[in-house]
């Protein structure tokens, strides 16, 4: 006997058959699925997950480490200085010997262009800008700045921390036990400036703020012109408030439509606030991490304070390495041309990340991300309460990610939602598999969260 269905009953019967045939793809928004559909989807996803676990994979997307191919771009630099090389700087200084506390002139000229300041505002350091940031905080903590008492003698002080942000920044200020870190939410234009202004201009215990202004770590956001201008126009309640402007990705573009960052130092000069910023960068992700050259830029007042410490700390940093870098690049244009080679290696990896996220998660309503024009990371926000679960699932399947919460002060993500993806190190084939597993784990964690509601 054939039973004829009509009206709504016919519609729902047909819909049910089609849904069964297509495996639920009609309703791909997980937050719109009913319990039965979610449970069915979860069963299939877990079976796929067990298959990956059985493969015994060891894949790494934890940190922004340049790949072997990127490191090989700078190998010719190792041949620049040989036993018969002239080791004199442009000023005639013998780079093999002691001296020149703030670095050779040609290095200061190059980094001045990278940071957008004059050479006299530049201090050349060793192989690590993070080291210079730590030394700066230590100097102000132990010796003070702007004629004020050392921070260590001022009791509990505060440092503003835009988040998600760079975990090693938070590690530096977290090391100093009298510094309380205050989370400032990031927006699409940079830190929440209403909140920044409220803290800085009304609380004299607020002494500084961390910033990665171009291609921020991990969001890949570049601060808007308005944000930079508001930083430059700050009227701090504390004379010794300083902006730690870590311009780590100042020339690390990935697309043909790169972001542009307004020059903070120029804007500060317009406002009579040239003492506000301490600016940093390095060649760590340009040549060899750990064997590069770092630099900071600041006003004369700030440099005088910093040099008063550095003159006891060192006689001068590695001038041969400075010379090697300068002769390898020749000039700023040489650095820019070199970065195009990095772009050729990195861009396909970032394109793959965005493609995989869009294909696997784009219509699931369980994750969001920013498509950066440069930098080293893609920041993914999964459903609230799921980041730790996703990272744990990935680890069990052999995928190493930055720890959930690491992008927030004290390692505490209030929403447990942010995950940083670092695609630079793995080869494309390994990256593709790691991303497949990441997306799979994101789906599993999301469905389990939705079923728990």
Annotate each predicted stretch with a short phrase.
Residues 26-28, 35-36, 41, 87, ...:
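PLP-dependent enzyme catalytic core of the Aspartate aminotransferase-like
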């Amino acid at each position: 006997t054939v039973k004829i269905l009509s009206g709504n009953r016919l519609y729902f019967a047909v819909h049910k058959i089609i849904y069964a045939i297509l495996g639920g793809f009609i309703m791909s928004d997980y937050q719109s699925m009913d319990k039965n559909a979610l449970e069915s989807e979860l069963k299939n996803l877990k079976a796929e997950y067990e298959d990956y676990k059985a493969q015994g994979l060891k894949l790494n997307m934890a940190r922004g480490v340049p790949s072997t191919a990127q490191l090989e771009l700078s190998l010719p630099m190792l041949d620049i200085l040989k036993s018969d090389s002239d080791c004199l700087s442009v000023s005639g200084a013998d780079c093999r010997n002691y001296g020149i506390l703030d670095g050779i002139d040609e290095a200061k000229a190059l980094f001045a262009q990278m940071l957008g300041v004059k050479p006299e505002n530049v201090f050349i350091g060793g192989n690590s800008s993070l080291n210079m940031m730590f030394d700066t905080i230590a100097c102000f903590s132990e010796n003070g700045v702007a004629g004020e008492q050392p921070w260590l003698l001022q009791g509990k002080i505060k440092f503003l921390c835009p988040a998600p942000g760079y975990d090693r920044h938070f590690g530096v200020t977290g090391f100093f036990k009298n510094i309380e870190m205050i989370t400032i939410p990031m927006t699409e234009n940079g830190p929440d400036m209403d909140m920044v202004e409220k803290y800085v201009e009304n609380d004299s215990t607020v002494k500084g703020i961390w910033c990665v202004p171009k291609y921020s770590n991990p969001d890949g956001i570049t601060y808007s012109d308005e944000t930079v201008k508001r930083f430059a126009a700050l009227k701090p309640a504390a004379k010794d408030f300083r902006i730690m402007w870590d311009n780590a990705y100042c020339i690390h573009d990935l697309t043909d439509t790169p972001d542009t960052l307004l020059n903070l130092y120029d804007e500060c000069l317009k406002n009579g606030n040239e003492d506000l910023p301490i600016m940093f960068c390095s060649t760590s992700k340009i040549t060899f991490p750990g064997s590069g050259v770092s630099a900071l830029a600041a006003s004369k007042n700030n440099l005088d304070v910093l040099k008063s410490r550095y003159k006891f700390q060192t006689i001068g940093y590695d001038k041969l390495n400075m010379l090697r870098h300068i002769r390898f690049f020749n000039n700023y244009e040489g650095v820019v041309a070199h970065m195009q080679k990095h772009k050729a290696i990195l861009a396909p990896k970032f394109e793959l990340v965005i493609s995989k996220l869009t294909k696997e998660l784009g219509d699931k309503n369980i994750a969001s991300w920013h498509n950066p024009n440069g930098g080293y990371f893609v920041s993914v926000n999964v459903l609230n309460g799921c980041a730790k679960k996703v990272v744990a699932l990935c680890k069990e399947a052999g995928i190493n990610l930055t720890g959930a919460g690491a992008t927030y002060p004290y390692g505490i993500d209030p929403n447990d939602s942010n995950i940083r993806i670092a695609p630079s190190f793995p080869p494309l084939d390994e990256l593709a598999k790691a991303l497949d597993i990441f997306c799979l784990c994101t789906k599993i964690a999301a469905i389990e969260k939705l079923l728990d509601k």
